Amino acid sequence: MYKQLTSEQRYAIKLGLQAKMTLSAIAKQINVSVSTISREIKRNHNSRGGYTWRLAHEMAIERRERVVCNRLTPRPILQRALKLLVEEDWSPVQISGYLAKQGVSISHETIYRVIRSDTSGELLQHCRHRLKYRHHKRRKRKTKPVSIPNRISIHQRPAEADGSRFGDWEMDLILGKNQKSAIVTLCERSTNFLIMQRLPFVKDSKHLANQVIDMLLPYKQQVLTITTDNGSEFAKHELIAKNLDTDIYFTDSYAAWQKGAIENTNKLIRQYIPKGLDFNMITDDFIKQTQYKINRRPRVKLDFNSPYKIFFNHFS
């Protein structure tokens, strides 16, 4: 039967190996089975293939602590949490909060520990940032100022359109490789509910306007305002405003934070549709599935409910 070795026994193994003793002789000397010695050496060898007793002992302690941590969480609960990670790509915080609403207790720290201890790296692939957070300096885009006729500044937007009431939207366009493909994205600010569709004619303002009208027409009564940036693709904003009976406001130049809801949503989309990808390589069904997955994610701001649930609660 396998026994946990002490530091003294590990030191004795080291001395035995140096003395060219057989595994059987070492096992007899420290009163353990030969299989225990064999497993110990295979499990704790260093990069050169040798056995370092001190490193072996530290690694064993770390493994033991990890097992103890995971042992506190019943296996079915851990499996349920990891299923949400792998199938839904939710963050540990989202998983923990969602399960808590179901009466199931598991901390996000426990989930993070399991991810870090997964030597295959498979679990890490389902974490949005791969547990690495890099801060890049923002570069100002070298674009010519665009004059959008009759644009209304965000500073004229009513105070109540602060993201807390239902019906205030943000609009954007994400571009594919070489700016030859695009996807229109719309986000309802209070619920983070996302609507996204491929734009067949990239940066064509009239086609974009008609597409946005089609996307939001089913929710026309729930479109109080739309906020967007100063891209030339939004030049036909008056056509959108007229057909949806709404008001459209434009952010200041280089002020992406003024439409933070759609900016953050676009980052979630990039988990599935990365930068540099030609959108013509993906299907409309894949785009719909991406929208579906993002709308199903529980959010902290929604008390770990999903945007889909809270959005359609307003219609019940």
Where are these regions (language model features)?
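Active-site beta-loop-alpha junctions of metal-dependent nucleic acid enzymes
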Residues: 175-179, 196-220
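Short, basic alpha-helical/linker "hinge" immediately adjacent to a nucleic-acid-recognition surface
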Residues: 1-89, 93, 97-98
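Two-metal-ion RNase H-like nuclease active-site motif
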Residues: 166-176
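Basic, flexible linker segments flanking DNA-binding modules
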Residues: 55-59, 106-161
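Acidic/histidine-rich, metal-coordinating catalytic segments
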Residues: 221-236, 254
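Short loop/turn microsegments at loop-to-beta-strand junctions
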Residues: 181-183
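Charged alpha-helix within mobile-element recombinases
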Residues: 19, 29-31, 78, 87-88, ...
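Mobile genetic element proteins and their domesticated derivatives, centered on retroelements
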Residues: 13, 37, 81, 95, ...
